[in-house]
Amino acid sequence: MAVRGMKKNYSYLFGILTITVYLVGLLLINRGLGFTNVVVIACSMVIYYVANVYNMTGRYKLRDIVIIIAINFILVMITKFLKVFLLNEAIILFGLLTMFQIIYRYIVMIGLAEKKKIVFVGENGYTDDLLESIKKDSQYKLSGFLKEKKDINILTKKLLNLCENKKVDIIVDFTSNLLYDTKLVDKLLQYKLNGMQYYNYLEFYEMYENKLPVSNLSPKWFLENTGFEIYYNSFNLKAKRILDIIFALLIGICVIPIMIVAAIIIKLESKGPVFFIQERIGEGNKPFKIVKFRSMTTDAEKDGPKWATKNDNRVTKFGKFMRLTRIDELPQLWNVLRGEMSFVGPRPEREFFIKQLEKEIMYYNLRHTVKPGLTGWAQVMYPYGASIEDAYRKLQYDLYYIKNHDIIFDMKILLKTVTIVIFGKGR
């Protein structure tokens, strides 16, 4: 399986240690584990993730402490009302969890104080994007940017000088000829055996940005690279389909009251049908009818198809709320059950726009080699867009998803989608 992301991630360690503290708390107050506690632990892990408590990459703000305290208070009070603890026991557990998480995060941030030193060698169209990201990242420091174009030997000497002075932890190679020098390769290999990391810019861009540099990819790159198991891993595909059916049925039953209320409000707010049915292009370029709650006026496309924009006056008042919370997408659970869509995948587009985008964007057609989704990596990583440039940016994430797909990645995307819904970060 391909590597996803290279930024330090302490989520797993943080989760394991939080569970340990919870269990120690149970022992201190002489309580057994019990089924209820298992459920509370599992739910708390999910809630911490959704609330972004596990994110250790940014600066530690007062908001983070408030979120930790609030979540722990709610969780402990729930266990209190479930009669798992007495009040004084709940207070002990709350204190243990809160103090541990705050102290742990400070320890992690201190550990991140020693930044990884990165050297960029050469430059191309993606260098500036990566430079901006590195400058904002608390884990990394740009210790060199070597962009000598005329003489590769000068560039090589500068690079080796940085390595000898221990100013390099990571080399990112944007050139096409740096490794032609066999003597340089031998020396870099020795540094690598002592802990230095070397990446060509395509590898680094994918790992660091969690997307693919589409415009610099060639058919040869697709042929040689690992990943893309979504095309041939039958176990993952079957598991994905089974989970789609289970989730669609369970969620569908749970959201029936929400859908009924939404349908009534839509009908009361504006004239026209409750549902919006439109042809989209799915896997294998096969058209299918997508079903959504109508969020626009009935004459929204009287002048022809066009993308929705920010503050689009065609969107109804309740439609804005539905788009923020993704309620308008709920009827697509029917498309999932029918096998036309999956929970996770590239969002399906209309043929009218696809024809335009395939002319303008390289590899755009690859989106249609997999089943479209209710949500996707592009949707949780990039804001709603309404231009060819936005479509290109989203394709970078879509192809990254296709290359790195597995069930765990799907779960991560679904959890991020929950965050978007809860905090109203939709369109």
What are these regions (language model features)?
Residues 102-115, 265-275:
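Aromatic-capped interface at the extracytoplasmic side
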Residues 235-299, 335, 407, 412-427:
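A hydrophobic, helix-centered structural microdomain
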Residues 309-371, 413-417, 421:
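A short, structured surface patch at a secondary-structure boundary
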